[in-house]
Amino acid sequence: MNTDQLIKTTSKYDTPTMCNAMDVILGTRSAVGFTKSSMVTAQNSTQPIVGFAKTAKIRASSPPLKSQKEINNIRMEYYEYIVKNEKNPVVVVEDTDFPNCIGAFWGELNVAVHKGLKIKGTVTNGLLRDLGMLDSGYQVIAGSIGPSHAFVHLTELDTPVNILGLEIKPGDFIHADQHGAMTVPKKYLDALPHALDLVVKKAVSYTHLTLPTILRV
């Protein structure tokens, strides 16, 4: 399956359905491959974020150790990185202050910038702010909400990250909505459409079950 068809197909489903499809592919239930805590969203939308991970790390609890010039350079490198060689980039940012995050990288300005760069959306364990002022065309799925940006700054790019128990590597296929996020290893991507079809058919069959039938299952 080509990338465009993969994105189109998986965008029709919510993230719990995607998790169920992975269970079908694996032939068993799993305790890995998805976020382990509740998340908040910038937009009240059920449309999922679907694409391939562009990763970074941030910190806000203390001032950066680098010079302002170095900080500006890494910010420019970040913008260049997230738009390079990927049609469907999803920005995934780990706040290394977690679980004591104090500064929001995601607010009115960064949402507008990332929307302008054609990023598909953001998943982070960090903070979100400027509610009510965020561009309606861009979704951020975050760990929590806070009022300040504190000393927030980028520390690493293109690196493995951990978002609420979900390990994500650069280039991983990611699917996220108001329920949280999950990833699908590349070796299983071709199996997704059939697995999703089986999940949907099984769900439909459940709607016809009577209580006595359920008790016998």
Predicted regions and their residues:
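Extracellular/luminal Protease-associated
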Residues: 80-125
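Structural motif
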Residues: 29-31, 52-55, 89-92, 119-123, ...
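A short alpha/beta connector and helix-capping loop motif
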Residues: 180-198
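Conserved small/polar residues in nucleotide/adenosyl-binding loops
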Residues: 207-213
